[in-house]
Amino acid sequence: MIIYREENEIIKKALENLNIPDRVYIFDTTLRDGEQTPGVSLTPEEKIDIAIKLDDLGVDVIEAGFPVSSLGEQEAIKKICSLNLDAEICGLARAVKKDIDVAIDCGVDRIHTFIATSPLHRKYKLKKSKEEIIDIAVDAIEYIKEHGIRVEFSAEDATRTEIDYLIEVYKKAVDAGADIINVPDTVGVMIPRAMYYLINELKKEIKVPISVHCHNDFGLAVANSLAAVEAGAEQVHCTINGLGERGGNAALEEVVMSLMSIYGVKTNIKTQKLYEISQLVSKYTEIKVQPNKAIVGENAFAHESGIHAHGVLAHALTYEPIPPELVGQKRKIILGKHTGTHAIEAKLKELGIEVGKDINKDQFDEIVKRIKALGDKGKRVTDRDVEAIVEDVVGKLAKKDRVVELEQIAVMTGNRVIPTASVALKIEEEIKKSSAIGVGPVDAAVKAIQKAIGEKIKLKEYHINAITGGTDALAEVIVTLEGYGREITTKAASEDIVRASVEAVIDGINKILAKREK
């Protein structure tokens, strides 16, 4: 695996002389802060399943929830604690005896206790003095330690607290027995330079491990978490997919892969499982992962641009920072209007179709033309679209062998109009026109074609499949025609159902007539 701190001269120089730890501990709070995402409510069974998967992923600490919040929460946390997972199980508790007692009763390994320290919270929420807040924090920590449980202490809204007072609070917390102190950027107001400064100042005074909990209100949660690590923070709070209140929290997958691939910092995470757990959490929370989400989004390793796709096919690192397999993803060449011939040829090969072997150059050119035409209509071309186009192109007779060609078609339909179709066919250099009515536009068009060529060829079966979703889906029409003692099945694909139907019928007619000639 490439480590940019070693390979990239700019990064290497920028990180010189920094106090970056060799190993960072991952504290996952998906089941607590992640569940506080508006609209998310996990059942105890879902929380247990996610906890098992988080443990399998390799997180060091699982914050299983806020025990005092509900009986269901307590039930889930107790069950998680009984599973004997490798991860340390943590419960959140305000610096209040009632909260702490409920957390202790759940059997957690660690209690994450907190009290707000910023001027805003002191004045408007707590209505307490600086000294009173320190006393409350110390009492809570000492009470937890009396029960032999590890303590993580957070000064809520730390990043809007006066720095001298913040240092005093944390020092008193450590003196009371806190095993680790956590610095929450509660409303995400930090910038990386400021976060580095704050953690660096705390490291001078605090002799226990320092953790950070960054919110993403300005889109800086991951950047601030990494800045904290640059200053020496040993633990980072994260959530899967960056879930959390308001703008969310630092995304675990982004933090971990940045630490490993850019900084060369070790974590215990099995990165190949990142995509899998991202999908699981998305399923249970019913919050879709945005396609362009780093690391786990569907487009994270997808390429459409001809230049990019060609580069990736030549050497993956030209347009990818890490191999997709490293996070459980797969590289995707997305076909559309920007796609070049190299990418389309590679996609065909992926689908088991080789140019020069399974299709000729003319057929390949037609396939490219049709794929780009779909892309021009704003459509994302799927593998099934490609297969349908290939089947349609390959299944058609060469132009020189075709007896019937469609010159023109016009269809009229409506709620007060009888469906009517008019066609002009070129049959052995002669133009024949006909019109017909039907129970629908497709029926009218097929009847008009049959009328133009005579009654010797009949439509026996007609099937239509929507290959992809949406009102502009590519439709595949399959028809079975009978004529001259022969039965032929053909297919055609188009976004226009009438057009696909007409092309399938005409292709079938040509095949019957070609066999008749032979």
UniProtKB/Swiss-Prot annotation:
UniProt pathway annotation: Amino-acid biosynthesis; L-leucine biosynthesis; L-leucine from 3-methyl-2-oxobutanoate: step 1/4
EC number: 2.3.3.13
GO molecular function: 2-isopropylmalate synthase activity; metal ion binding
Keyword set, alphabetical order: Amino-acid biosynthesis, Branched-chain amino acid biosynthesis, Leucine biosynthesis, Metal-binding, Transferase
Function: Catalyzes the condensation of the acetyl group of acetyl-CoA with 3-methyl-2-oxobutanoate (2-oxoisovalerate) to form 3-carboxy-3-hydroxy-4-methylpentanoate (2-isopropylmalate).
Quaternary structure and interacting proteins, as annotated: Homodimer.
Name recorded for this polypeptide: 2-isopropylmalate synthase
